[in-house]
Amino acid sequence: MARYDVIIAGGEVLDPANNRQEIADVGISGGKVIEVAPDLDRSDAGEVIDAEGQWVMPGLIDTHVHVAGTRSTWDPAMGHRMLVEAGTTTALDFGGTPEGLIGGIQRMGAGLNIGGLFGMVPESTIPKDDPPPAAVRDIVDDALTRGAMGIKML
């Protein structure tokens, strides 16, 4: 049995958290990086991905994306693909409803660590003029029940 499921071979590894920038191989097993070193034994991998001339780095985090969209014609799966292709592995959506976000995940598969915030926008998601505290509590409770991770006040 191969030690690594995948080796990403010969790329320029950029890892600021560990002060690393070097040409190296990245050994992955069980979905986790288990070793980073020059010249890992490629015969000990189920798959080898040639990354020569490419950067290899931890996934990016985008804390304000609009993958769920607000228009009925917007397909959240397209936003998911765009994020993954750009190297993003974790994203907080701030562009649509929890249902839209979940619908995109169901069609595309997650592929990302993704969560959504509910925006409290006067004249859009909350009344324009000074809503009573009980109304705001109800709106927040509803958003959290529908799957929002948090609330952003605008």
Describe each region flagged by the PLM.
Residues V6, L40, T63-H64, E85:
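General secondary-structure edge motif
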Residues A24, R71-T73, G96:
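Hydrophobic alpha-helical membrane-insertion segments
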Residues W55-V56, D75-L154:
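Divalent-metal coordination cores built from histidine and acidic residues
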Residues Q54-P76:
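Di-metal (Zn2+ and/or Mg2+/Mn2+) metal-binding site signature of metallo-dependent hydrolases
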Residues P16-A17, G69-R71, T125-P127:
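A generic structural signal for short coil/turn motifs at secondary-structure boundaries
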Residues M1-M57:
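Histidine-rich, glycine-flanked metal-binding segment
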Residues P16, A51, T63-V65, F94, ...:
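Generic detector of well-ordered alpha-helical packing
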